[in-house]
């Protein structure tokens, strides 16, 4: 236990010393500030009678809130893992009692915890501080969102953060390649934005299902903004599929990362 506490202190010092890492780690707080102050000003500047435009704008904002906060934590994890590979830190850790696999599991565990906490912080904060601002015809979209909904989404979304971080860091040999690969895979965070289009509200929505973050985001979006469609699943079903998919991807990428490091 003492070894892992020492590692945690080391990881936190590494993050605090690097301005970029510190920014990525604090992005959920920045997002919360935007969601409770800036975005509501955008809604107020729009014509309240134009329900369609207001609805689309809120959908886009909610997708940003649901996806970007945790995505930055995956970038942080990927960069830290690439740095470990680039500086041969993992080779040193391999001969310690923790071992490389133990260290990777530890890193994923605390990043997963950070992701879950940050997601709940953003959603609970937005709901309680500015929930009434996210309203159409006087009805707040956050009225549909329960504590269990937020916690469930955060737990599933955290799996995606860990899986994506391993995917991004597995194929990069150094920091330069790491930045390039991260930029290339960054589109994953933006693709769910297509859900605002009418064409992706029925069966075609499942074309986006290849993306591991689609399932939890889609389920949460339907809780916030209910949309009638025979193609839609229930909220628990979306989360269950998302959890299974991300766990499988996490296992595959964990083994891939260790194989890349070992050989």
Regions found by a protein language model. Give the residues of each.
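A structural motif at transmembrane helix-loop-helix junctions in multipass membrane proteins
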Residues: 19-23, 149-187
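Selective transmembrane-helix segments that form parts of the transport pathway or gating/packing helices
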Residues: 73, 98-131, 239-246
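Secretory targeting signals
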Residues: 113-160, 166
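Transmembrane helix boundary and interhelical loop/hinge segments in multi-pass membrane proteins
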Residues: 49, 74-96
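Hydrophobic alpha-helical transmembrane segments of multi-pass membrane transport/permease proteins
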Residues: 15-44, 59-76, 112-119, 182-195, ...
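Aromatic- and glycine-rich beta-strand/loop motifs that create alpha-glucan
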Residues: 1-28, 88, 262
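Junction motif at the cytosolic side of a transmembrane helix
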Residues: 167, 224-228, 239-263
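Short hydrophobic, aromatic-rich alpha-helical segments embedded in or entering the lipid bilayer
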Residues: 2-6, 198-230, 236
């Amino acid at each position: 236990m003492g070894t892992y506490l020492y590692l945690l202190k080391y990881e936190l010092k590494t993050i605090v010393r690097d301005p970029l890492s510190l920014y990525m780690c604090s992005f959920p707080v920045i997002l919360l500030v935007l969601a409770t102050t800036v975005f509501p000003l955008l809604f107020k500047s729009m014509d309240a009678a134009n329900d369609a435009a207001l609805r689309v704008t809120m959908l886009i904002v909610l997708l940003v809130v649901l996806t970007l906060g945790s995505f930055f934590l995956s970038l942080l994890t990927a960069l830290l893992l690439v740095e470990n590979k680039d500086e041969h830190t993992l080779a040193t850790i391999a001969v310690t009692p923790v071992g490389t696999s133990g260290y990777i599991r530890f890193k994923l565990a605390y990043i997963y915890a950070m992701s879950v906490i940050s997601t709940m912080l953003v959603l609970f904060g937005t709901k309680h501080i500015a929930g009434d601002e996210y309203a159409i015809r006087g009805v707040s979209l956050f009225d549909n969102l329960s504590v269990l909904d937020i916690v469930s989404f955060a737990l599933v979304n955290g799996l995606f953060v860990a899986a994506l971080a391993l995917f991004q860091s597995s194929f990069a040999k150094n920091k330069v390649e790491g930045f390039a690969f991260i930029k290339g895979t960054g589109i994953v965070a933006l693709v769910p934005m297509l859900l605002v289009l009418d064409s992706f509200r029925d069966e075609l929505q499942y074309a986006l299902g290849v993306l591991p973050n689609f399932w939890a985001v889609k389920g949460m979006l339907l809780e916030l903004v209910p949309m009638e469609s025979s193609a839609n699943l229930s909220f628990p079903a979306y989360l269950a599929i998302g959890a299974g998919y991300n766990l499988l991807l996490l296992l595959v990428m964990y083994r891939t990362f260790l194989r890349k490091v070992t050989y």
